[in-house]
């Protein structure tokens, strides 16, 4: 499935040069490099403090494609061409069974106020939602359904944050409502991890 999905992405996204990285080690790291304005996929633990760690016990092939600075030119807000600003996630990571839509928010400090953390989390949800809906639309317009490649249950939106905001069901109704709006718009459940097993 990963090869068919990858081939489809290559057909749909031809405007900007990007790399397709394929690795199959037991431990992998994806991280966002602000200096290079793109994400990287590596076996090196050098940047583990700001990485999404991928546990790959079966050592099967996992693919990484940078979205912001890869599929879409870094900083380009009107990538759809409708004269509106659209956000996008940082990268796609996928194998034959699951597709991860990843947004990194690793540059916050441990003592950052909860309101600021929530602002980062909320913005990350928007980034993932906007790109996911765009990706689905691009697939449909080309005659394919994204869900022919990955079912909703196997599409995992991940916000990679060291320090996540508190979300208590009774005290944070607004935050829970925002997460529910994300779920209603995408039919996906937002996750917050710094480590994930594929």
Name each model feature, range by range:
Residues 1-84:
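Basic, amphipathic N-terminal segments that precede the first structured/catalytic domain
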Residues 24-27, 108, 197:
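Residue-level detector of flexible, active-site-proximal loop/helix-junction positions
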Residues 152, 156-198:
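Short, low-complexity, polybasic intrinsically disordered segments
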Residues 115-160:
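Catalytic cores of nucleic-acid endonucleases
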């Amino acid at each position: 499935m990963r090869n068919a999905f990858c081939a489809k992405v290559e057909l749909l996204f031809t405007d900007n040069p990007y790399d397709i990285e394929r690795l199959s080690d037991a431990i992998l790291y994806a991280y966002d490099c602000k200096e290079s304005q793109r994400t990287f996929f590596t076996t090196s633990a050098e940047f583990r403090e700001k990485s999404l760690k991928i546990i790959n016990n079966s050592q099967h092939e996992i693919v990484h494609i940078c979205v912001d600075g890869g599929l879409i030119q870094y900083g380009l807000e009107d990538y759809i061409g409708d004269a509106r600003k659209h956000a996008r996630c940082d990268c796609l990571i996928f194998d034959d069974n699951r597709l991860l839509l990843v947004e990194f928010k690793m540059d916050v400090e441990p003592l950052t106020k909860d309101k600021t953390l929530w602002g980062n989390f909320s913005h990350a949800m928007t980034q993932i939602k906007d790109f996911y809906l765009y990706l689905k639309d691009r697939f449909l317009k080309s005659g394919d359904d994204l869900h022919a490649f990955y079912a909703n249950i196997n599409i995992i939106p991940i916000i990679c944050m060291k320090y996540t905001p508190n979300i208590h069901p009774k005290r944070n109704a607004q935050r829970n409502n925002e997460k529910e709006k994300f779920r209603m718009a995408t039919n996906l459940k937002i996750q917050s991890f710094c480590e994930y097993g594929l």
